Amino acid sequence: IKGVDKFKSFNYNIPADISSGLFFIAMTILSNKSKLNLKKININSSRMGAIDILKKMGVKFKFRNKKKYKGEIISDIQVKSPKKLNSINCPSSMNSRAIDEFLIIFLIAAKARGISYFKDIGELNHKESPRLKVASKFLRMIGVQNYSTNDSIKIIGNPNLKLNGNYVMNNYLKDHRVFMMSTIAALTLGGNWKIYDPECSRTSFPSFLKLVKKIGGKFKLYKK
């Protein structure tokens, strides 16, 4: 490799990430009579596993203004809260394309009609926190029956799930996706919540809370 003395500057716009957008898609799905339009999202097929899972659960998406950009396909995505949310027996073949999104998918499955089953997902326990164990404990905390092993979880959905108690989510390992999943649960299911370590959301989504507030989410930040 031959080095160069000077590098040329350039401008490059990075398309929006579907993984981050999925938290707001979940908020839409879990809120009655809601709709959402996400702009200029990267819809590379390797990143669309969660969307494909949600389609199987009865969520309908519209893709508009598709175009190629720097070798990627970007598109606007429109989604509405479904009248009926179905459970899913998720094929293992879909796991690798949705591994980072399973936490929020589990929350959605908690309000689906029927029993959802996810298997061969032991990798979740080797993320920023043991996410499969954390998810199972979280679902039990909010009254959702589930049965988990080291690499699977069965979730008994409740379409009428609503919360009215007091809930505390410690998130002791400061997992950004655990914090964002908990926040979406608090905003859509009700109850009074205290969720620790909001700053960890900056790991992958620095503007998460700002956007939550922009679309009407109400919360207060407290210093430790």
List the model feature ranges, each with a label.
Residues 1-224:
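Short, structured segments at the rim of ligand-binding sites
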